[in-house]
Amino acid sequence: MKKVYNVLAVMMLAAIMSSCSQKNNDTFIVVANESDLPRENETVEILFKALQDINEGLTAENVVILDAEGKQVPSQVYTEADSTTVKLVFQASVKAGETVEYKVQKGVREDYPVKAYSRHVPERKDDYAYENNKVAGRIYGPALNGPNDPRTFGSDIWLKSTERMVIDERYYNELEKGISYHHDYGEGMDCYKVGNTLGGGALVPHVLEQKEIAGENFVLQKEKLVYDVVGSVITGNNWATCKHVCNGPVRTKAVFTYEPFNVGNVKYSAVRELELDANTHFVKWVTTFIPEEHKADSMVVQLAAIKHDVIAEHVDKEWVAFTEKASDPQDNEQPGNISVAVVYDPADLADNPIKYNGTSPDGHACIVTKEAVNKPITVWTGSGWSKAGIDSPEKWTEMVKNFAYAQKHPLNVTIKK
């Protein structure tokens, strides 16, 4: 009997040691909020290899993120456009001044619904449409490069008052059933006007243009967007190529290239990244302007969005927010208000003083500064609707202010083994 007890004791001790060893080998992603602003559903981004290096057998198919209560947190593993960099993203909620730990382990992933989605829409003249559970929009593609078409980096804002994905349904109804997406049937619409403007926001070159005034003996210098000979805003043609990177429960992403276009005496091509995460009203754009033959080291750029029937506006150093009346061609009484914002990366503006922020001569809310060429420049464009939670200009201004503050005070993310 004594031998039996000894065997049982050894087995229990081994189990305890195994349990302790397993706990000691647990991996945690530690998210610290050192700011004065609570963060709700803010995306955390980790190089997946950093987790794989300390977790043998961890894959995109079996990685699970758990919160403090042991519940799965929706996560996403995707490969960047370079086909090499692999990232894991999930969203954390952390109170001001606090730290939260998320456990990483191998397991069976739950079926997380897609909350960030985008795609090329060849059936609608090469649109590239994007959405999350809060906002939606599109940019125009090469099929709209005609002389009377909108040629712009600017985005078209789509309004939505539902958390489900709607762009595929709206395109199908518009193109196959003749049900216009320009009218609100209860969940939103496309009533925003872009044309040859920067629409809901974009980063573009900005030049000092010299115009000779007929009959006068002087030259007038006027700061403005780059204009073509007929006076339309241009940034070259619409995107030439696009590469879809991912959709998922946390993030959608795509990369666009633009053919060379003239900016003063220099030709530039451009690369733009679109990144939209779940649970936000703000789209991240990373733009790189590439001069031909290295003819420039720096350039003046303008982050801007067109203003229509504006009822409120707030201009800050790093952002501009405004609210304007929406317009439904079939229902002028009930369209509500659209809120729009542009936000410049505060890290960039710390090194590049602002030349101007306010309203440009052609009616854009804008921030003008100087940047190096061949440099990825990060900005955000934001939108909201009074029928989808953004019920006052004051609420929108506060949301934009807090978002800009969060970019200046990012979460501190580390891995603990």
Task: Describe each PLM feature range.
Residues 244-299:
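Acidic, contiguous internal or C-terminal segments within carbohydrate-active enzymes
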Residues 2-10:
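Sec-dependent signal peptide recognition
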Residues 103, 108-232:
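Solvent-exposed N-terminal domain segments of exported/luminal and surface proteins
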Residues 81, 86-94, 342-417:
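Beta-strand-rich recognition/accessory modules
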Residues 58-85, 262, 309-324, 347-355:
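Solvent-exposed beta-strand/loop surfaces of large extracellular or lumenal domains
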Residues 24-119, 150-154, 158-160:
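Alpha-mannosidase-like glycoside hydrolase catalytic domains involved in N-glycan trimming
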Residues 24-27, 298-354:
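Polysaccharide-binding surfaces and accessory modules of carbohydrate-active proteins
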Residues 18-19:
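C-terminal motif of bacterial Sec signal peptides marking the signal peptidase cleavage site
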